[in-house]
């Protein structure tokens, strides 16, 4: 899986928008109906729909509560202080990226938000890398459990995880083989 597929999956998450148009007809989708829309009345729609409406200037995107600078600072502090990965909202990085890219004028202090999200990603990436290194240093095979990993992180760590799996197979074969 790559970043584009992760964003595609995250695009089905619901987000609040304030429509600037009124339309009494709901939009019928496979996943369910969205709408009707009334100008100025907030409603929740999939992120991908919000981005399409935003591009047509038909709505204002309401950033999720966790996308506030103070909330992001709390998340960064939690990530820094905890040994493991902190629990994040579903599709945190993908939704952040899509909104910063496509709805930046609707995000308060967008540059600070972008910087904090990147800092959180970097901290988590460093933790994942150091965990993989520690796992590979072990002399015996065992299982690893990764809690609170985001889909995009698992996707980007796939090569490292595959290397760990192959290393485990090599170690197992070494212990199971008999000398000639």
UniProtKB/Swiss-Prot annotation:
GO terms for biological process: DNA replication; double-strand break repair via break-induced replication. It comes from the Eukaryota. InterPro entries: GINS_A, GINS_bundle-like_dom_sf, GINS_Psf2, PSF2_N. The keyword Nucleus applies. GO terms for cellular component: GINS complex. Keywords: DNA replication, Nucleus. It is found in: Nucleus. Belongs to the GINS2/PSF2 family. Required for correct functioning of the GINS complex, a complex that plays an essential role in the initiation of DNA replication, and progression of DNA replication forks. GINS complex is a core component of CDC45-MCM-GINS (CMG) helicase, the molecular machine that unwinds template DNA during replication, and around which the replisome is built. Component of the GINS complex which is a heterotetramer of gins1, gins2, gins3 and gins4. This is Probable DNA replication complex GINS protein PSF2. It comes from Caenorhabditis elegans.
């Amino acid at each position: 899986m790559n970043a584009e597929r992760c964003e595609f999956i995250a695009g089905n998450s619901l987000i609040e928008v304030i429509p600037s148009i009124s339309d009494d007809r709901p939009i019928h989708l496979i996943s369910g109906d969205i709408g009707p829309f009334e100008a100025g009345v907030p409603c929740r729609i999939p992120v991908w729909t919000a981005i399409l409406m935003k591009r047509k200037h038909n709505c204002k995107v309401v950033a999720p509560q966790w996308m506030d600078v103070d909330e992001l600072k709390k998340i960064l502090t939690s990530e820094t202080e905890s040994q493991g990965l902190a629990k994040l909202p579903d599709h945190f990085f993908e939704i952040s990226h899509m909104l910063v890219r496509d709805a930046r004028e609707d995000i308060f202090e967008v540059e600070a938000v972008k910087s904090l999200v990147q800092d959180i990603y970097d901290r988590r990436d460093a933790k994942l890398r150091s965990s993989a290194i520690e796992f590979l240093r072990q002399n015996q095979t065992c299982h690893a459990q990764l809690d609170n990993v985001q889909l995009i992180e698992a996707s980007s760590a796939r090569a490292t995880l595959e290397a760990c799996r192959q290393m485990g197979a090599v170690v197992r074969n070494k212990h199971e083989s008999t000398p000639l």
